[in-house]
């Protein structure tokens, strides 16, 4: 009965080996030929104690090859020589505790054929791994080939180094001499770089300080050039428009009048003198206009630049705040304001507007005003500017102090006109409220004195602010025609 069971068991094992024989041929061939790309250097070191109790350390270098039945990494430890038959007694004696955290060395001597499976390389590697060894050194390679068999189970996780015949003999003699002297032999395994210039190690960019600096500068240069291109593309239309408007402003400067400033000795002499060229043009335009085209006073012009009653124009430039000297050349803008050419020319070329009234010298118009719907909500500002329908009627009351300041100059002018030439209420034309002029710059100077008033005269689409002194000079052609025709 036992014989029958033994025969059945052997038959099953043989059939299993036959089924798995063909897939494992490749493993057997690789293990037998030992053609592996990775090799290892084995440094064997032992300390000799001389007679004078001095220590002498001796190190030899051996060359081996990583076996496919184990892993391939660098390690080290003390060397322990183990018999090749110790793995066969694993069931009876158990694991070998002497190789724990050491490197066992197994020398294959003449091994009988019936013991081939017991002393095979994969069995030795698994036994050393289970015993806690750091690595396994076997040799010679010619005898290891005869003990190989198809690997039925996965390989070991510790490095397995196979030595050739010459290296095995050197290691054997070194261990023998160290054993005679009673020295502990240590072993260290490291990789061998057979090809110093491997293709895999060729690097296009080496991370050196110079290369990193050059790369950073190149990136900064690329970003800077990209930003320049983007800014140029985005600002190109604006630049063309600015150049075009600047050329138009330069053309407008060539068409503006330049006059010499002259101071008058007294007011009476100035009244008898010939009016300035600006008011001469105003008088000529008024004489050519219709009877109903009257120059109505705009109360918003009361906030214009204050002028002294004893002078015919501004005494100083509002830009540089320098007083005008006799014979100084002044540039007269289309709106009537005067400045030093050196002060106002750069401003007009860049801004194209009068610094005082914001009159556009290129398009020749004032800034756009708000719509009537928006102006209806500003009753506190426009109510004080509404004209009177009759001489006896006062201006509408307003909470602001500005309306009080505006009514008194009007009354002063009203009393200055003789009663004989004072118009009746039914002849006075109806005054339409004008929208306040929007100005981007704040009010620069305080209101003029009470006995002064400015008339905003609109001629040919242009507007000019005239001081009371000019009004006194031009009263002969301003007030009298009104009394005879419309007033």
UniProtKB/Swiss-Prot annotation:
InterPro entries: Znf_RING, Znf_RING/FYVE/PHD, ZNRF3_Arkadia_E3_ligases. Keywords: Cell membrane, Cell projection, Endosome, Glycoprotein, Membrane, Metal-binding, Signal, Transferase, Transmembrane, Transmembrane helix, Ubl conjugation, Ubl conjugation pathway, Wnt signaling pathway, Zinc, Zinc-finger. It is a single-pass membrane protein. A zinc finger (RING-type) spans 317-358. Residues 370-381, 472-481 have a biased composition (Basic and acidic residues). Autoubiquitinated. The chain crosses the membrane at residues 211-231. Glycans are attached at residue 10. This is Probable E3 ubiquitin-protein ligase plr-1.
